[in-house]
From Swiss-Prot:
Organism annotation: Brucella suis
SUPFAM superfamilies (alphabetical): Porins
Subunit note: Monomer.
Parts forming coiled coils: none
Comment field (misc): The pore formed by Omp2a is larger than the one formed by Omp2b. Omp2b pores have optimal permeability to allow growth and protection against harmful compounds. The larger pore formed by Omp2a may be advantageous for intracellular growth, when the bacterium is competing with the host cell for nutrients whose concentration is particularly low within the phagosome.
Gene Ontology BP, a term: monoatomic ion transport
Record's function text: Forms passive diffusion pores that allow small molecular weight hydrophilic materials across the outer membrane.
GO molecular function, one term: porin activity
Family statement: Belongs to the alphaproteobacteria porin family.
Protein name in the entry: Porin Omp2a
InterPro entries: Porin_alphabac
Impact noted for substituting A241V: In strain: 83-210
Superkingdom of source: Bacteria
Keywords: Cell outer membrane, Ion transport, Membrane, Porin, Signal, Transmembrane, Transmembrane beta strand, Transport
């Protein structure tokens, strides 16, 4: 055997061995394409598509810490020290388009922690039976604050009453409802018509709400009923709402006007009337037949906004509040606020002191 034959034989053996190994090799499948999260800008900033769907989701919320001192301007009692409270609010919005309009949901979870001054000097202990210190101590709570579905102008679920939301609440101050304007959270079914000329209207059937001392839910099949009309333009808006309370068979109404003096300065005024001259009802919770609120906002700079609100009711309660909202950095706002309440007339017999001065500083990180 010559050298040439030996080389040819070796080459043939190598080719055969390579073919056998190739036949036994495992071929890896092609990797599936990764579906990255897509931004959804159809409903504003912060939305993204839920993978595999055409539904847009937004996750947002805030962390808040309040420090309060002085008097409680709602009750007139002396805090006798610092009251402090924290809240973490987590919110979810979803939206998608259907043949009947935009289908949406909104939910908000609140986790609260309150640590108030004990209201008792020089000692610890359980003072829950002492009315002078009942608001002291530590409390915690978790709430499903909101959970509702929207489709076009239709809304069903847990929300705040249209008696508040449709007209625009009150001012941009923390202690805005010292003169109360009605209960807030409720189960409801509502429909809002929005025209193309600035006109809108609402009708709502509501279950009723509650506050610290009273339950204002309905006592049968007849719901609370709220209706409202609004006209809005570049100059501002005017809105009115009327509500019927079937439990006490009385009604309440209010009208609010907002005017944009400039792009930085705006004012508002709201008047309300109730056929039942008592705060113990679902809607007209001010004292007496009537109440009035008013306020102003001035955007001084991109970081600083001044807010002022005043209110007075038929029974003689007067409340004034002012604050400065300072945006330290984007997403983090510090708001010092000072409030004063004068309890006159029929309110004198319900509070500890006729005059109350209180202060609060709020630290809030929104995301």
């Amino acid at each position: 055997m010559n050298i040439k034959s030996l080389l040819l034989g070796s080459a043939a053996a190598l080719v055969a061995a390579s073919g056998a190994q190739a036949a036994d090799a495992i071929v890896a499948p092609e990797p599936e394409a990764v579906e990255y999260v897509r931004v959804c800008d159809a409903y504003g900033a912060g939305y993204f598509y839920i993978p595999g769907t055409e539904t847009c989701l937004r996750v947002h919320g805030y962390v808040r810490y309040d420090v309060k001192g002085g008097d409680d301007v709602y009750t007139g009692s002396d805090r006798k020290g610092w009251d402090k409270g924290a809240r973490f609010a987590l919110m979810f919005n979803t939206n998608s388009e259907t043949e009947l309009g935009t289908l949406g949901t909104y939910t908000q979870l609140r986790f609260n922690y309150t640590s108030n001054n004990s209201r008792h000097d020089g000692q610890y202990g359980d003072f829950s039976d002492d009315r002078d210190v009942a608001d002291g101590g530590v409390s915690t709570g978790t709430d499903l604050q909101f959970a509702y579905i929207t489709l076009g102008g239709f809304k069903v679920g847990i929300d705040e009453s249209e008696f508040h939301t449709f007209t625009g609440y009150l001012g941009d101050v923390i202690n805005d409802d010292v003169v109360a304007a009605g209960s807030y959270r409720t189960g409801k079914i509502a429909y809002t018509f929005t025209g193309g000329n600035g006109f809108s209207a609402v009708i709502a059937l509501e279950q009723g709400g509650e506050d610290v001392d009273n339950d204002y839910t309905i006592d049968g099949y007849m719901p609370h009923v709220v209706g409202g009309l609004k006209y809005a333009g570049g100059w501002g808006s005017i809105a009115g709402a009327v509500a019927y309370d079937p439990v006490i068979e009385e009604w309440a109404t209010k009208v609010r006007g907002d005017v944009n003096i400039t792009d930085r300065f705006s004012v508002w005024l709201q008047g309300a009337y109730s056929s039942a001259a008592t705060p113990n009802q679902n809607y007209g919770q001010w004292g007496g037949d009537w109440a009035v609120w008013g306020g102003a906002k001035f955007i001084a700079t991109e970081k600083v906004t001044f807010n002022l609100q005043a209110a007075h009711d038929d029974w003689g309660k007067t409340a004034v509040t002012a604050n400065v909202a300072y945006q330290l950095v984007p997403g983090f706002t510090i708001t010092p606020e000072v409030s004063y309440t004068k309890f006159g007339g029929e309110w004198k017999d319900t509070v500890a002191e006729d005059n109350a001065w209180g202060g609060i500083v709020r630290f809030q990180r929104s995301f």
